[in-house]
């Protein structure tokens, strides 16, 4: 996708960029009712997730992460914007008359044909088990548990790589750099997720963040002592501690958050932090 640059006509467009989008008519049976941004508050109105609130109303698009229409060819009819994710989505018309949304693979265009199954070609947009893929294949929408649907490598520009197959397991390198084992019976989609340059987009104005449901982030050092451990002092005072902390007093940098005996630990060959 092309990134369009705004001319500096007004402060709101200063250094702003816009991703070129393809808009089209939406499938009514694939869209569920109002889907509001998370406000970050519980039933009592207490903030449980900071920096969230507001945002434009959204309609939820039902995405087919399972790709369980086996051996039925489908054609890409539209490439659409989805407000619920960074990646674009594309509408598929199958030969049996059914319509579904899938994540838009990079390089796929309107009119391309896709299919899922066990004996299909290695082509962008096709979905098949890892047993049928050659080593070095770039994939996305990867299952962790067979039949549960794709859970890994679904963000815009995400791509995983199949690097080895041995026994009942396949070794994959994930977008985070983590190398882990996954059952060879799990399915994945060939190719990379589209909308690769989304991380280079500049919103250009604070209001654009509010449309996305994101509230301002305030530094703890400018707060009062009652609000943050870093707060207080006269003028630009230091935080007054040896190490930075969260608003609740826990270490902010370097604290491990993953459980040591998590069930999936035995499947990880190399952690994403150890590269």
Curated annotation (Swiss-Prot):
What residue spans carry the region label Disordered?
A: 225-249
Main location group: plastid
Answer whether the UniProt record assigns the keyword Isomerase to this protein.
no
Q: Indicate where this protein resides in the cell.
A: Plastid
Q: Which domain of life is it from?
A: Eukaryota
Q: Give one GO biological process term.
A: mitochondrial translation
Keywords of this protein's UniProt record, alphabetized?
Plastid, Ribonucleoprotein, Ribosomal protein
One GO molecular function term of this record is: structural constituent of ribosome
Report the GO terms under cellular component: mitochondrial large ribosomal subunit; plastid
UniProt xrefs under Gene3D superfamilies: 2.30.30.30, Nucleic acid-binding proteins, Ribosomal protein L2, domain 3
Tell me its family. Answer: Belongs to the universal ribosomal protein uL2 family.
What subunit structure does UniProt give?
Part of the 50S ribosomal subunit.
Name of the protein in its database record:
Large ribosomal subunit protein uL2c
User: What is the originating organism of this protein?
Assistant: Cuscuta reflexa (Southern Asian dodder)
């Amino acid at each position: 996708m092309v990134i369009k640059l705004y001319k500096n006509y007004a402060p709101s467009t200063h250094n702003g960029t816009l991703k070129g989008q393809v808009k089209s008519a939406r499938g009514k049976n694939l869209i569920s009712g109002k889907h509001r941004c998370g406000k970050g508050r519980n039933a009592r109105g207490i903030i449980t997730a900071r920096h969230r609130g507001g945002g434009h109303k959204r309609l939820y698009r039902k995405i087919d992460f399972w790709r369980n229409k086996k051996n039925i060819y489908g054609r890409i009819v539209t490439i659409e914007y989805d407000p619920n994710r960074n990646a674009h989505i594309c509408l598929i018309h199958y030969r049996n008359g059914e319509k579904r949304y899938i994540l838009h693979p990079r390089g796929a265009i309107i009119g391309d044909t896709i299919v899922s199954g066990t004996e299909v070609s290695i082509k962008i947009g096709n979905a098949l088990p890892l047993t049928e893929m050659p080593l070095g294949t770039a994939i996305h929408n990867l299952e962790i548990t067979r039949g549960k649907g794709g859970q890994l490598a679904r963000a815009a520009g995400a791509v995983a790589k199949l690097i080895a197959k041995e026994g009942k397991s396949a070794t994959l390198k994930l977008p985070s750099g983590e190398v882990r084992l996954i059952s060879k019976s799990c399915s994945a989609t060939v190719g990379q997720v589209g909308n690769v340059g989304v991380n280079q987009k500049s919103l250009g104005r604070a209001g654009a963040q509010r449309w996305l449901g994101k509230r301002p982030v305030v530094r703890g050092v400018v707060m009062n002592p009652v609000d943050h451990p870093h707060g207080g002092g006269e003028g630009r005072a230091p935080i007054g501690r040896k190490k930075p902390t969260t608003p609740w007093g826990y270490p902010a940098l370097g604290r491990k958050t993953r459980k040591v005996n998590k069930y999936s630990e035995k499947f990880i060959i190399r952690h994403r932090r150890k590269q």
